């Protein structure tokens, strides 16, 4: 597409407006995991927190790197052996692909395929937090409520993985990277608000996030990610 039109972003560093947004997507997820851990356990400190990452490609790799730097223990699986080998260099511990969803961890971070949260995976899930970068994580809307009833805190995918689109917006608008990071780091604040409203209203976080999005689209009050999203 980029050979036919100038209206394609996020491909490589030779573009006029910049390249791969994956590191910024990962940073937003990292901020979101910290907010999730704080809400669930009372502290945003990731030291010793066990994170099971499903998929260590472009986003999962950068996320794992940040998590390890923050003191977390990272366990990961990927069908691509090259991705696995690169992740091992970071200190990631490898888990079988078929075991990653049910792995005993504090956080399950899906960063690969969509629809990974479904009837079967919810039944086998052993992490009290689901917070990752994959798109369309819920196989159907009902699975958000199923997670809530199981006591699993879910960070809605379109909120926690918004760092990439915020970066793409920066590339197009040609604004500073500092402003971009400031906007991305608001993802944690937005999730904290969603989590609190979910508790107060006894609604699943996915519904609360969608309602906040609708309010923003309609020009009503209600925080959502930051001015770039």
Regions found by a protein language model. Name each.
Residues 11-19, 102-107, 124, 162-164, ...:
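Short, basic, helix/turn surface patches
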Residues 48, 79-159:
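Rossmann-like adenosine-cofactor binding region
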Residues 37, 128-229:
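Adenosine-phosphate binding glycine-rich loop
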Residues 1-3, 64-69, 86-89, 165-170:
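Short acidic, glycine/serine/threonine-rich loops at helix termini
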Residues 1-42:
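Glycine/serine-rich phosphate-binding loop and adjoining beta1-alpha1 elements at the start
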């Amino acid at each position: 597409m980029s050979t036919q039109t100038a209206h394609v972003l996020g491909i490589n560093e030779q573009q006029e407006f910049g390249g791969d947004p994956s590191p910024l997507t990962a940073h937003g997820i990292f901020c979101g995991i910290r907010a999730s851990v704080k809400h669930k356990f009372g502290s945003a400190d990731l030291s010793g927190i066990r994170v099971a990452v499903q998929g260590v490609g472009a986003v999962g790799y950068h996320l794992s790197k940040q998590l390890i730097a923050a003191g977390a223990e990272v366990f990961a699986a990927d069908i691509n052996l090259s991705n696995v080998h690169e992740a091992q260099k970071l200190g990631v511990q490898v888990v079988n692909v078929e075991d990653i969803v049910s792995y005993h961890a504090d956080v399950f971070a899906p960063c690969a395929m969509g629809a990974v949260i479904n009837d079967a995976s919810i039944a086998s899930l052993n992490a009290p937090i689901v917070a990752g970068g994959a798109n369309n994580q819920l196989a159907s809307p009902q699975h958000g409520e199923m997670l809530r009833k199981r006591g699993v805190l879910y960070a809605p995918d379109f909120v926690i993985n918004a760092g990439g689109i915020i970066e793409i917006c920066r590339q197009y608008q040609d604004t500073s990277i500092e402003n971009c990071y400031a906007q991305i780091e608001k993802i944690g604040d937005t999730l904290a608000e969603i989590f609190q409203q979910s508790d107060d209203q006894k609604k699943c976080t996915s519904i609360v996030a969608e309602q906040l999005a609708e309010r923003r689209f309609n020009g009503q009050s209600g925080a959502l990610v930051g001015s770039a999203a």
